[in-house]
């Protein structure tokens, strides 16, 4: 299953990497691997694209999942129940309890990440689980980790996740697993190195009821990639992932498309223009110098207050090279590209 899904997704990976380089550099580790803590903005010469994505993400968070006001209500489908005052009071109390549960959880932090990935890559995924205190826990997954499929209705019905886990944490995360000698050896000798775990959730074709967690509607399997060891087999009553997709260009594409994809040509052009304009401005502010080949005693000192000696009687002088650059034209063209990028992220509408 994993190998098939990986082969289907490979054409997207270079596209996602390029998007992350320009729009979301902190997540630019899809086909390129970065050391934790290193700089990620080396290709960015203009921050318009990253700022536009941040602004739209914050706006979606404020409009759809506001932190200071209720962002959902519960209603009955049955019209008769909707006219019952006691039933409505009960439903309102349920909504308040749900809001309290969301407030206690890490939902706001993770949904903000979800909006960023959705607007940049067009697809994002959030895992929903409960902890020992029966509170909800949310985790937004990096686009590089997920492999999805959809059913005949166009809904995502399976997700396979490939993630890293420290060897020393394998026993704690999978206490009931029968670990082979190879994994135990890695835990003992290389506890701080990463193991690769594959977690797949997919529909159970033959559910047999809820008498145990292996007979539920959704199968959940955790496999150690290096050894192929099945670490855990369980299930879910409901699909535990939320997988929004911004837009789909055609019915044969499973992964979504994003406003960042529309803005990518303008963003790449703007970065190239900015790099050129910076060089042109540097040449005007600190221009190349034309020095006569005779009459001056080297070295030439261009620092403030520097003394330069030349032979008396000569009319030769050190002069700046006139490069004839037109900075206003370059700046005007950059503004055109900035406007196009902002329009893709609806910045004008958000700022009014």
Where are these regions (language model features)?
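Extended, helix-rich architectural segments
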Residues: 1-193
């Amino acid at each position: 299953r994993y190998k098939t899904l990986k082969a289907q997704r490979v054409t997207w990976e270079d596209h996602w990497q390029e998007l992350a380089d320009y729009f979301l550099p902190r997540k630019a580790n899809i086909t390129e691997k970065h050391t934790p803590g290193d700089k990620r903005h080396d290709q960015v010469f203009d921050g318009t694209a990253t700022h536009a994505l941040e602004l739209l993400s914050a706006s979606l968070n404020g409009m759809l999942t506001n932190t200071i006001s209720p962002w959902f209500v519960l209603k009955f489908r049955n019209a008769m129940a909707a006219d019952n005052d006691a039933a409505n009071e009960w439903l309102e109390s349920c909504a308040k309890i749900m809001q309290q549960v969301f407030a206690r959880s890490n939902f706001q932090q993770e949904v903000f990440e979800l909006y960023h990935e959705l607007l940049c890559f067009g697809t994002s995924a959030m895992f929903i689980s409960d902890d020992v205190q029966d509170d909800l826990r949310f985790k937004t997954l990096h686009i590089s980790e997920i492999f999805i499929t959809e059913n005949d209705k166009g809904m995502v019905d399976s997700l396979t996740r490939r993630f890293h886990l420290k060897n020393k944490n394998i026993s704690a995360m999978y206490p009931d697993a029968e670990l082979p000698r190879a994994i135990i050896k890695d835990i003992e000798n290389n506890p701080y190195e990463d193991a690769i775990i594959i977690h797949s959730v997919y529909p159970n074709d033959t559910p047999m009821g809820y008498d145990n967690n292996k007979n539920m509607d959704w199968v959940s399997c955790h496999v150690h990639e290096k050894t192929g060891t099945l670490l855990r087999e369980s299930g879910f009553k409901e699909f535990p992932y939320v997988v929004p997709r911004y837009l789909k260009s055609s019915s044969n594409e499973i992964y979504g498309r994003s406003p960042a994809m529309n803005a990518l040509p303008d963003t790449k052009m703007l970065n190239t223009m900015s790099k050129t304009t910076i060089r042109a401005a540097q040449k005007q502010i600190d221009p190349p110098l034309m020095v006569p080949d005779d009459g001056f005693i080297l070295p030439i000192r261009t620092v403030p207050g520097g003394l330069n000696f030349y032979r008396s009687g000569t009319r030769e002088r050190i002069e700046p090279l006139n490069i004839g650059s037109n900075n206003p034209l370059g700046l005007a063209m950059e503004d055109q590209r900035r406007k196009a990028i902002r329009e893709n992220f609806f910045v004008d509408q958000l700022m009014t």
